[in-house]
């Protein structure tokens, strides 16, 4: 479980996340939607402490993953990033072979013998429905794959180090419909063993894949009930009107 307790994130005097108190349950998918610049990506970066070295970045309150406050002074950021995997908008593959891309992180963090690498590679590539497509091409450069395949490869590399939490920052925004459907199916298959936070601009997608949908507006999170119809506000970035009757996470 991920827990925010009166959490605020700010850059100098500008508060991006304000007084957030909310729980994201384990073994489920929570989708986060909101206007551009509302702080969605900042919230993801907070969970793996990617903003630590940004000048004037500061926090108040606490964030707990599995009951551990990740911003305690004695918190081990290296161990945190083993527990939290993040997938970005555009696939991030290295100019190495498909095989080497999968085991990239394993070499550093997993206690596994090199002789077991092939079995691990097959296992995670099967998990992301990519094995049958690449099993005869493992020595080829990962950059020869399509974008959809590269995104699944990125996810396979993340799964290889066995994270508890998966953070998905609009992972299908640059993909075609077929690849998007493949990623959505894949993430659904992973939710029983991971806490997943999926950021998207696509409201229909959020409601179709997530167990819970939250809206981030002006630094505050509001719930979007599955029974609440979403009416897109073409002339305003505000989501307030469609959330008047929603209940769930307090502001």
Annotate each predicted stretch with a short phrase.
Residues 62-79, 139:
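ABC ATPase NBD Q-loop/coupling interface
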Residues 68-69, 115-136:
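Conserved ABC ATPase "signature" region
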Residues 162:
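Conserved catalytic motifs of ABC-family nucleotide-binding domains
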Residues 166-169:
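Catalytic Walker B motif of ABC-type/P-loop ATPase nucleotide-binding domains
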Residues 180-192:
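Helical segment within the ABC ATPase nucleotide-binding domain
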Residues 194-199:
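Conserved H-loop
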């Amino acid at each position: 479980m991920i827990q925010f307790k009166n959490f605020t994130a700010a850059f100098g005097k500008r508060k991006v996340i304000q007084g957030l108190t909310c729980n994201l349950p384990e073994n489920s998918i929570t989708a986060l939607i909101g206007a551009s610049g509302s702080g969605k990506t900042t919230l993801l970066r907070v969970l793996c402490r990617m903003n630590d070295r940004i000048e004037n970045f500061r926090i108040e309150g606490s964030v707990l993953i599995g009951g551990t406050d990740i911003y305690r002074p004695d918190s081990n950021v290296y161990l945190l990033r083993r527990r939290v995997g993040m997938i970005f908008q555009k696939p991030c593959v290295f100019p190495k072979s498909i095989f080497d891309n999968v085991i990239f992180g394993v070499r550093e963090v997993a206690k596994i013998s090199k002789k077991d690498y092939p079995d691990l590679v097959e296992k995670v590539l099967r998990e992301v429905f990519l094995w049958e497509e690449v099993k005869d091409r493992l020595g080829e450069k990962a950059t020869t794959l399509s974008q959809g395949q590269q995104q699944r490869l990125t996810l396979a590399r993340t799964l290889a180090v066995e994270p508890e939490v998966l953070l998905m920052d609009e992972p299908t925004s640059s993909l075609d419909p077929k690849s998007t459907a493949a990623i959505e199916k894949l993430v659904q298959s992973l939710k029983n063993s991971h806490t997943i936070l999926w950021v998207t601009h696509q409201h229909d997608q959020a409601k179709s894949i997530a167990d819970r949908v939250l809206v981030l507006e002006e630094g505050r999170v509001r719930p979007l009930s599955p029974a609440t119809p979403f009416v897109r506000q073409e002339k305003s970035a505000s989501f307030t009107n469609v959330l008047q009757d929603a209940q769930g996470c307090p502001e």
